[in-house]
Amino acid sequence: VQRVGPSTGMPTRTQQCDIKSCAYASHGDTMHVLLCPADPADCFYMAVQAFDLAERLQTPIMVLSDLDIGMNDWMVPELEWDENYIPDRGKVLNAEELEEMENFYRYLDVDGDGIPYRSLPGVHPKGAYFTRGSGHTT
């Protein structure tokens, strides 16, 4: 929940001051996905959307609400959950696909969309990879 902040003397004033900070919080080589719900119902549905986008794009998704949503009473329509909903896990290789590959390179962009395929832990030994913060393999 965004607000001016406790150190300014205005901790309960509604503001959207973190949007720009979140949008440009990097070295400038990446874009960030920001979701800004307008009411509690949006918070519910955007939370699901945020998880799907994070899995599909393999990047953090920021959901930013303001103090108005966090502190006020709201009347919203009854929230509905689709029992047939299937989470979007993005580009995930299964055991058969990994078996067919000669080598699996975690960060190789094979189809040019900027999003590499990934494997889930324990699916296949070829899907294992070591990663660290200082670089990638091809």
PLM ranges: what are they?
Residues M46-T138:
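Flexible, low-complexity linker and terminal segments
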Residues V1, C22, L35, I61-V63:
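Generic structural hydrophobic/aromatic packing signal, biased to beta-strands
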Residues V1-S7, P40-A41, L67-G70:
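Acidic, glycine-rich active-site loops and adjacent beta-strand->loop/helix elements
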Residues D29-D52:
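Active-site/ligand-binding-proximal alpha/beta "capping" segment
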Residues V1-D29, W81-D82:
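Flexible glycine/proline-rich, aromatic-decorated loop/lid segments
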Residues T8-P11, C22-Y24, H32, D52, ...:
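Generic structural signal for short, flexible, solvent-exposed coil/loop and linker residues
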Residues G5-T12, V33-P40, N94, R106, ...:
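Hydrophobic alpha-helical scaffolding
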